[in-house]
């Protein structure tokens, strides 16, 4: 199963994270399929860069976001776009 999750990058005591699509059986910092964004919680406010189009693609292909990534997607409106896209596809079918 493909998951959209965080992988840690950055120095010791200065974590930053990449938002990636990867197989759920891979270790946290293992081989990823695609980099979908960046998250730095140490800045004020937290720095987040998202590739919305690619995230929506992976979600439409059945990728499951982790709880942390889901909260980021909801905060920036990507999850709402996905749900709207999903319901519009259902109603047109």
From Swiss-Prot:
GO cellular component, one term: cytoplasm
GO molecular function, one term: structural constituent of ribosome
Assigned keywords, A-Z: Ribonucleoprotein, Ribosomal protein
Pfam families on file: Ribosomal_S16
InterPro entries: Ribosomal_bS16, Ribosomal_bS16_CS, Ribosomal_bS16_dom_sf
Top-level taxon of origin: Bacteria
Cross-referenced SUPFAM superfamilies: Ribosomal protein S16 (SSF54565)
The keyword Ribosomal protein is assigned to this record: yes
GO terms under biological process: translation
Homology family: Belongs to the bacterial ribosomal protein bS16 family.
PANTHER family registered for this protein in UniProt: 30S RIBOSOMAL PROTEIN S16, SMALL RIBOSOMAL SUBUNIT PROTEIN BS16M
Protein name (Swiss-Prot/TrEMBL): Small ribosomal subunit protein bS16
Lineage of the organism: Bacteria, Pseudomonadati, Dictyoglomota, Dictyoglomia, Dictyoglomales
């Amino acid at each position: 199963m493909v998951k959209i999750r965080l992988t840690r990058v950055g120095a010791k005591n200065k974590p930053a994270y990449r938002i990636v699509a990867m197989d759920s059986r891979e270790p946290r910092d293992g081989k990823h399929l695609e980099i979908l964004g960046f998250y730095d919680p140490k800045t004020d406010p937290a720095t987040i860069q998202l590739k919305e189009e690619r995230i929506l693609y992976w979600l439409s292909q059945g990728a499951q976001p982790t709880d942390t990534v889901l909260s980021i997607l909801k905060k920036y409106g990507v999850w709402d776009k996905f749900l709207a896209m999903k319901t519009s596809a259902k109603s047109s079918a």
